[in-house]
Amino acid sequence: MSLNEVSLRIPTEHMANVFGQFDANIKKIERTLGVTVIVRDDQIKIIGNESATNGAAEVFNQLHELSKRGNVIAEQNVNYALALLQEHKGSQMVEIDKDIICHTINGKPVKPKTIGQKDYVDNIRKKMVVFGMGPAGTGKTYLAMAMAITAFKNEEVSRIILTRPAIEAGEKLGFLPGDLQSKVDPYLRPLYDALYQIMGAESFQKNMEKGLIEVAPLAYMRGRTLDNAFIILDEAQNTTPAQMKMFLTRIGFGSKAVITGDATQKDLAPGAKSGLDVALRVLKNIEDIGICELTSKDVVRHPLVQRIVQAYDDYEKKQSNKTNRKNVRAGRKNDGRQK
């Protein structure tokens, strides 16, 4: 088989970032695509079969473009560039990076990092109600918070309302010590963390005192109509069908709602229906409601977290298949007995 060669230039100021510590990114690309990469000065030569060398060149070009845009190239960037290459979507990586939602208090840009996240953010921009489902680390809550804060700063809404069911792991608010705020704070900590990072603690506290930002358990939404607000319901998998219906019918004029959850992390009583599951079935065909499914491909935490999520996904699929096969066999036995 004849070997193909592709040459390209990576300027010296970007080489360390693109190649990684001890050339870790080069080695990853070589292993994954089965190519050999030779670096001389600012030139790199890629040797292998035609498809692999062209693919490797595309990955290096995408990483170079990200580096030029000020990104620190991490292992997850390389992994995602290689994954997009397999899906023939490599060119979308830089386009995703251009979508800056806002900046943190330290000036760091907040933006989607995967195709799934970009679709989620675009849905929030276009739709009145958006469901964002996915495992931990997919950015579903953080991106929703960034969109809420941006809408608030741009005066598209007059307030932000953050809520989640506050009954988890068998703990009821009435049995916990302290006032309401101290009772619900532990449950709402992930929302506070995002607010502090993007808005800053001082600005957050001022807006809380003015009533422009409200953080409360879901039960406190009952009987209200929420106009001109950006409302986020987090941990929606732990709602009951009645709670979910109550929440959705609170949405008023000029408001936007984002519902986030992970169907695999329910803390409901055994056998209890999840309001999130029911809502997705009931509302799937309604216009102006967006439903976004984020997966292990959208995990943007440490690469090990992505592998853990994928391993659990694979395990749960195998268990589900085993259960289905058992049910089929049991059904056949019952049919035989009836005959």
State where each predicted segment sits.
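Short glycine-/aliphatic-rich beta-strand segments at the starts of folded cytosolic domains
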Residues: 1-17
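Conserved helicase motor core of SF1/SF2 NTP-dependent helicases
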Residues: 105-117, 123-233, 237-339
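Short amphipathic alpha-helix segments
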Residues: 14-31
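Interdomain "pre-motor" coupling segment immediately N-terminal to P-loop NTPase/helicase cores
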Residues: 38-97
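Hydrophobic side chains in well-ordered alpha-helices
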Residues: 18, 25, 55-59, 244-247
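Conserved loop-to-helix interface motifs that mediate assembly, gating, or partner/ligand docking
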Residues: 87-108, 112-115
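A short, structured beta-strand/loop element
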Residues: 31-38
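A positional/architectural concept
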Residues: 1, 18-19, 39, 320
